[in-house]
């Protein structure tokens, strides 16, 4: 039985640039680095940055909706969003869903999101205004 997401490994084209972005700009804790990689954490999530010479930047309009969303406290959302904008990140989407969200790219074009909210809050909003064809399968969350 699956218990949780163990780790996320992201292929990067410039390890130093990525470590600076993920550690210094986003604030993940840096635990170790080596010639071709680094281990960081965000809460209980372990993130591995792995240098890969085959990694190529993919413009957001040429890729799908797959993205990685990180929980942010409500009071930290605006300051962090502004810091990212001031750092010149590329914004790939405007928020149109429940809860505050800021959608941006990392240096390699991985789609990321800052999000204020929880699954429980999202489901409550969906119960008020369900998506087309939405069926609820449990009362949990």
From Swiss-Prot:
Catalytic activity: RX + glutathione = an S-substituted glutathione + a halide anion + H(+)
Role of this protein: Metalloglutathione transferase which confers resistance to fosfomycin by catalyzing the addition of glutathione to fosfomycin.
Enzyme kind, highest EC tier: transferase
Keyword annotations of the record: Antibiotic resistance, Cytoplasm, Manganese, Metal-binding, Potassium, Transferase
Protein activity control: Requires the monovalent cation K(+) for optimal activity.
GO CC entries: cytoplasm
Gene Ontology molecular function: glutathione transferase activity; metal ion binding
Domain of life: Bacteria
Subcellular location: Cytoplasm
Name used for this protein in its record: Glutathione transferase FosA
Subunit note: Homodimer.
Outcome after substituting residue 7 to Q: Decrease in fosfomycin resistance
Domain VOC: 4-117
Main location: cytoplasm
Name of encoding gene: fosA
Keyword Oxidoreductase: no
Family: Belongs to the fosfomycin resistance protein family.
NCBIfam families on file: 154989_fosA (NF000026), Fos_GSH (NF000496), FosA (NF000221)
Entry binding sites for Mn(2+): 7, 67, 113
GO terms under biological process: response to antibiotic
